[in-house]
Curated annotation (Swiss-Prot):
Similarity-based family: Belongs to the pyridoxamine 5'-phosphate oxidase family.
Catalytic activity line of the entry: pyridoxamine 5'-phosphate + O2 + H2O = pyridoxal 5'-phosphate + H2O2 + NH4(+); pyridoxine 5'-phosphate + O2 = pyridoxal 5'-phosphate + H2O2
Pfam families associated with the record: PNP_phzG_C (PF10590), PNPOx_N (PF01243)
Disulfide bridge map: none
Pathway membership: Cofactor metabolism; pyridoxal 5'-phosphate salvage; pyridoxal 5'-phosphate from pyridoxamine 5'-phosphate: step 1/1; Cofactor metabolism; pyridoxal 5'-phosphate salvage; pyridoxal 5'-phosphate from pyridoxine 5'-phosphate: step 1/1
Uppermost EC category: oxidoreductase
HAMAP family linked: PdxH
GO biological process: pyridoxine biosynthetic process
Function: Catalyzes the oxidation of either pyridoxine 5'-phosphate (PNP) or pyridoxamine 5'-phosphate (PMP) into pyridoxal 5'-phosphate (PLP).
PROSITE patterns assigned: PYRIDOX_OXIDASE
Protein name: Pyridoxine/pyridoxamine 5'-phosphate oxidase
Assembly behavior: Homodimer.
Residue sites binding FMN per the record: 44-49, 59-60, 65-66, 88, 123-124, 169, 179
């Protein structure tokens, strides 16, 4: 088995356990870290919507702060921390937009109210009042009546984080935690243990 395949299989195993754990609120939630062109770090929680050998996919408004940061600097990291399992996985890599057809397919499966919200929210921009947002929601709900498909806004899409580093961490007594990392180097993928 190739080392990247091995890392993805390990991720699938712990991700599956997190999905089944009753005390994990949302196993898909991860912290996305980006850095703007000016060097300011930014973090927020996103939801993983799929992963394979190409990378880890999430969806958002391209005009949001994270969309702008990724346009300026496509290097990013995500951290899955499943406290009830005492495990975490950190993935670093380069982010690219998903294909338009892939974004369309994901959008089509979203609940209608989320689709309307995707049109109505000017994500990360200032908001005069909650009433203004609710008015825009009502306007878009009228524009796209029940029973009709809500098209994907041009500013709404997905991103895929192609990994160059995947680190696994598991808590152990005495803070002698288990850590190991898969990294892509000039020679290909390598695997090594890390001190806690």
């Amino acid at each position: 088995m190739q080392l990247l395949e091995q890392a993805l299989a390990r991720f699938a195993e712990v991700y599956g356990r997190a999905a089944e754990a009753a005390d994990v609120v949302d196993h898909t939630a991860c912290t996305l870290a980006t850095c703007s062109a000016s060097g300011w770090p930014q973090v927020r929680t996103v939801l993983l919507k799929g992963y394979d050998e190409r990378g880890f996919a999430f969806y958002t408004n391209r005009h949001s702060r994270k969309g702008q940061a990724l346009a300026e600097n496509p290097r990013a990291a995500v951290c899955f921390h499943w406290a009830p399992l005492a495990e975490q996985v950190v993935i670093e890599g380069v982010v690219t937009p998903v294909a338009e057809a892939e974004a369309d397919a994901y959008w089509a499966g979203r609940p209608r109210e989320s689709q309307i919200g995707g049109w109505a929210s000017h994500q990360s921009r200032g908001l005069e009042s909650r009433e203004v947002l609710e008015q825009r929601v009502a306007e878009y709900a009228a524009r796209f009546p029940d029973g009709e498909a809500v098209p994907r806004p041009p500013h709404w899409s997905g991103y895929r984080l192609a990994p160059v580093r995947i680190e696994f961490w598991r808590a152990r007594p005495g803070r002698l935690h288990e850590r190991d990392v898969y990294e892509h180097t000039a020679e290909g993928w390598c695997h090594r243990l890390l001190n806690p």
